Amino acid sequence: MARDFSLKNTRNIGIMAHIDAGKTTTTERILYYTGRIHKIGETHEGASQMDWMEQEQDRGITITSAATTAQWDGHRVNIIDTPGHVDFTVEVERSLRVLDGAVTVLDAQSGVEPQTETVWRQATTYGVPRIVFVNKMDKLGANFDYSVSTLHDRLDANAAPIQLPIGAEDEFEAIIDLVEMKCFKYTNDLGTEIDEIEIPEDHKERAEEARSNLIEAVAETNDELMEKYLGDEEISVAELKNAIRQATTDVEFYPVLCGTAFKNKGVQLMLNAVIDYLPSPLDVKPIVGHRAENPEEEVIAKPDDSAEFAALAFKVMTDPYVGKLTFFRVYSGTLTSGSYIKNSTKDKRERVGRLLQMHANSRQEIDTVYSGDIAAAVGLKDTGTGDTLCGEKNDIILESMEFPEPVIHLSVEPKSKADQDKMTQALVKLQEEDPTFHAHTDEETGQVIIGGMGELHLDILVDRMKKEFNVECNVGAPMVSYRETFKQSAQVQGKFSRQSGGRGQYGDVHIEFTPNETGAGFEFENSIVGGVVPREYIPSVEAGLKDAMENGVLAGYPLIDVKAKLFDGSYHDVDSSEMAFKIAASLALKEAAKKCDPVILEPMMKVTIEMPEEYMGDIMGDVTARRGRVDGMEPRGNAQVVNAYVPLSEMFGYATSLRSNTQGRGTYTMYFDHYAEVPKSIADDIIKKNKGE
């Protein structure tokens, strides 16, 4: 079957913004005007097409990025609606990885907001071209000029309006197109009737000045245009459009548009801009991968239907009707349903059961997907987020996605025995869907610990376990896994002797304990000569030490980074046994605890905090108050980055604290780095607590 839309006429775009900027409503209107839906659903009524999870409709926020496809002006537009909440940045990262362009939605009253900065930085990392849609022009306090100025001040972006609004708030009634110098007036509530009129006299001067600013901003990226501009030559509409398109595709310029999705104004013109200025898969740099067999050898996945098939899986989700759905972006070649492909990341063969074109949560079955398409596959068993899919003879691995480690952990336990198995299944499925969600059983406490990107993230996952998997569970407070070690060396004896009629028990060992290097773990050395401890009992001595070290010597935490050298001992022909030497070794460790200066260690996290410079003082003070050590600072764009080491026990609730300290404009990542000694006063508290004092 031939493709419906050429690659040149395909657009893969994301809609991204701060929470509540009107992103989902904007997507809804796109679907309405492109004929995909017949009734418009409002987010605040909980009936939006793109927000299809129950939790999303309850909270009125977008959690998962629903993918949908629409047609406009002879083009196919694949749209991914991304969440704007900081706890769901992984969804934004996933989407940006597979998009060719994006529409950044701003609230006309607030302009660039904290989460806009975060997603903008992510889009810059992935080199995604953007256009900006200043939404909510009908809102009280809407200010287009202010919104544009925040793009310059907060993002340092080379952005300029390609449209101007006529009026604002209740008076917002028309839009001036600065490229073609036309004016569009809306005449009905649904925004389907638009009159093209002359630019009103009292707005002409303002429009001409804005057009001149637009040409100047674009000319900075285009020598040919700059020459014409400086020579006062006439610049045609076609020349200006081409220059804007080129500069936008090169991520050197960001066109700014205006409208109100809620009141149905400006969305069709924004769709025209998507077609005119955002790139097709042919206009962006082809993705570079490497050979699975030889990571040094680069392979280019060209956007060409006749090339070898290569795609990237960017999202896995469980669908209530068809089971596991794998969303993927095709970079080269084609794929037909029912065929076999290779997951080159995991070196597994997969069969594609069915191929689906997604529309929020409804779907249409298709036979073939082509290069540049975004679709979902049913039947892939081993494929996870970030995996490369390719033809069976191909062995390309596309650059995968890196996801941050969880920053908050909680314990969960099922309320009843019946919930136990269901909870295990639910956790497996949720981890498949979300690479930033981790679950494991703590061997020391036996608790199931879940980790995620923030309180809201885990709150929603626990909620999903309840609603989708019918699992009731209790959520506890998180706990830190401490460790213990020795700071001094000592030689000690461990002797176990018991006579109680009949055969007795006898084992005697002399062991030298010394601190080992950080991270080196436990090392056992046997230096017995002359058989004072028979060879068959040596493994029992080592096993006895290992068992005893699991429970520590101070507060019940595992003892790590210690060397033990068995250098002397004695035995009894009749009474000695493996068990006796095991016990003797554990007694030696108890004795060492009195002489080797044992201490408690805590996990230290490497924390990287990014925020606008004005919050630097507050952040540094907060890090110090949390017993943190600042390791360096560096500027990044118009933000500052602080690197620090902070104890994990001090990092709980940090997301909330950072949000309030930076008015939501800071972001952070953290991961485990090493174990370090706990200050004595805190260690004493831990010991008391664990001994139940």
Swiss-Prot record:
This is Elongation factor G. It is found in: Cytoplasm. SUPFAM superfamilies: EF-G C-terminal domain-like, P-loop containing nucleoside triphosphate hydrolases, Ribosomal protein S5 domain 2-like, Translation proteins. Catalyzes the GTP-dependent ribosomal translocation step during translation elongation. During this step, the ribosome changes from the pre-translocational (PRE) to the post-translocational (POST) state as the newly formed A-site-bound peptidyl-tRNA and P-site-bound deacylated tRNA move to the P and E sites, respectively. Catalyzes the coordinated movement of the two tRNA molecules, the mRNA and conformational changes in the ribosome. GO terms for cellular component: cytoplasm. Residues 8-282 form the tr-type G domain. Keywords: Cytoplasm, Elongation factor, GTP-binding, Nucleotide-binding, Protein biosynthesis. The lineage of its organism: Bacteria, Bacillati, Bacillota, Bacilli, Bacillales. The keyword Amino-acid biosynthesis does not apply. Belongs to the TRAFAC class translation factor GTPase superfamily. Classic translation factor GTPase family. EF-G/EF-2 subfamily. GTP binds at residues 17-24, 81-85, 135-138. It holds the Pfam family GTP_EFTU. The gene is fusA. GO terms for molecular function: GTP binding; GTPase activity; translation elongation factor activity.
